[in-house]
Amino acid sequence: MFDLRTKVMIGIASTLLIAAIVLITVVFCLYLKISKALKCAREVESCMDPTKAVSEKMIRGKPIIADPCRPLQCCDNCSLFKDVGAMPPCFCGTNEGL
């Protein structure tokens, strides 16, 4: 009835159609599962005491005790700080290098 080329084309087309239908079905099932899970979570949240839920989710931070900053002594050369490494001479003057 059909030649070999036509049978191959029909086979490929039907395979692609079946694969597309399977993928659409899988995506639709996943969508339904996710929407059902979100709906259940929303219903559970509405039944809970809102102040209790907020306090349970809150993580309290530990206070950080700051060490006093040590004063930096200014050098005469280019008004650099002693603790900082020396800068190249082009950075000493404000107009140098421009």
Curated annotation (Swiss-Prot):
InterPro entries in the cross-refs: FAM24
Subcellular location: Secreted
Annotated Pfam families: FAM24
Ranges that cross the membrane: none
Principal location class: secreted
Signal peptide: 1-29
GO CC terms, sorted: extracellular region
Signal found in the keyword field: yes
Family: Belongs to the FAM24 family.
Protein name: Protein FAM24A
Source organism per UniProt: Rattus norvegicus (Rat)
Gene for this chain: Fam24a
